[in-house]
């Protein structure tokens, strides 16, 4: 099964489970969790079921295309369901079966790995899913997002697209993966991987990046004062990516690193609070009424 077919199979499966299929969000981010389709939608009582593939940029992980499985940019297939279904783990195993992986014939383990994203004020109960000794998925029940307690609980399934495809295609090197017939992962991404690694470690203008971080931080705060959650959150994401670029260049000390993460976290918490208040003011319109009573 090539990578393109694998993604389409996951999309079809989760669509059948009631998830809407979205396109990736168009601002740089380090993980699919940071998309507003997860971060914001996990806040408050309104139900939400969605799936999307998310390119995730992690500058410090770039290896110029020379490492078989560490990348400046990788892909995640993200599934979020709120409230979390009681049978979410069974649904996940069903998705593997659709990919031709019979749980009865493979060693599939849920290894406890509670999750935290300090820069966004997020935390949850979590497990890594290991398939025959290889981690392929992160499974999380959100307890806190943007410093706010999550109720109802949102379940998040994050498939590592390249890792899962490497297992299915029995490839040792991600660049040897078949994206679709006659086209390899290398054909599409190798040059970008090499050049982005060069940028992240060698040529980025750190003075400019330091200025950009401050500028993005101010703009995020200004948009929140206007009550504009989504523009503000875009600039929080830009702060996060800019910090990651600075971190990759090694220009941020240990003390400064904690300070930068704290600044991003403060912005994320303000966004979360503002978003909750804006939805509350609207009466949480996506909450369904059953028998004349609100179902929360």
Curated annotation (Swiss-Prot):
Would you indicate the residue range of the signal peptide? none
Task: Provide the top EC class.
Answer: ligase
EC id: 6.1.1.14
**Which GO molecular function annotations are given, in alphabetical order?**
ATP binding; catalytic activity, acting on a protein; glycine-tRNA ligase activity; transferase activity
Q: Name one GO cellular component term.
A: cytosol
Listed under catalytic activity are:
tRNA(Gly) + glycine + ATP = glycyl-tRNA(Gly) + AMP + diphosphate
GO BP term, example:
glycyl-tRNA aminoacylation
Key words, A-Z: Aminoacyl-tRNA synthetase, ATP-binding, Cytoplasm, Ligase, Nucleotide-binding, Protein biosynthesis
Q: Name one Pfam family in it.
A: tRNA-synt_2e
Q: What domain of life?
A: Bacteria
Q: Where does the record say this protein resides?
A: Cytoplasm
Q: Which PANTHER family match?
A: GLYCINE--TRNA LIGASE, CHLOROPLASTIC_MITOCHONDRIAL 2 (PTHR30075:SF2), GLYCYL-TRNA SYNTHETASE (PTHR30075)
Which HAMAP family does the entry mention? Gly_tRNA_synth_alpha (MF_00254)
Q: How does it assemble?
A: Tetramer of two alpha and two beta subunits.
Its family?
Belongs to the class-II aminoacyl-tRNA synthetase family.
Q: What is this protein called?
A: Glycine--tRNA ligase alpha subunit
Give the organism the record lists: Listeria welshimeri serovar 6b (strain ATCC 35897 / DSM 20650 / CCUG 15529 / CIP 8149 / NCTC 11857 / SLCC 5334 / V8)
Question: Which lineage do the record's taxonomy fields give for this organism?
Answer: Bacteria, Bacillati, Bacillota, Bacilli, Bacillales
Gene field: glyQ
């Amino acid at each position: 099964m090539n990578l393109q077919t694998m993604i389409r199979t996951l999309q079809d499966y989760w669509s059948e489970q009631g998830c809407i299929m979205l396109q990736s969000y168009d601002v740089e981010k380090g993980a699919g969790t940071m998309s507003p389709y997860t971060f914001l939608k996990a806040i408050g009582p309104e139900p939400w079921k969605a799936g999307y593939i998310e390119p995730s940029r992690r500058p410090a992980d770039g290896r110029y295309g020379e490492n078989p499985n560490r990348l400046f940019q990788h892909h995640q297939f993200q599934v979020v369901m709120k409230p979390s279904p009681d049978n979410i783990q069974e649904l996940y195993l069903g998705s593997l079966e659709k990919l031709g992986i019979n749980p009865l014939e493979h060693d599939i383990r849920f290894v406890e790995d509670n999750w935290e994203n300090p820069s966004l004020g997020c935390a949850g109960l979590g497990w890594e899913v290991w398939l025959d000794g290889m981690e392929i998925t992160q499974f999380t029940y959100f307890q806190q997002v943007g410093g706010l307690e999550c109720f109802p609980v949102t379940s998040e399934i994050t498939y590592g697209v390249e890792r899962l495809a490497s297992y299915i295609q029995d490839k040792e090197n991600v660049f040897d993966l078949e994206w679709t017939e006659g086209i390899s992962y290398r054909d599409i991404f190798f040059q970008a991987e090499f050049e982005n690694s060069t940028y992240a470690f060698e040529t980025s203008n750190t003075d400019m990046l330091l200025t950009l971080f401050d500028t993005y931080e101010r703009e995020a705060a200004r948009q929140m004062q206007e009550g504009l959650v989504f523009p503000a959150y875009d600039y929080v994401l830009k702060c996060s990516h800019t910090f990651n670029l600075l971190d990759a260049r090694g220009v941020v000390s240990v003390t400064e690193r904690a300070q930068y993460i704290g600044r991003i976290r403060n912005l994320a918490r303000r966004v979360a609070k503002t978003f909750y208040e804006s939805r509350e003011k609207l009466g949480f319109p996506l909450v369904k009424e059953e028998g004349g009573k609100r179902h929360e």
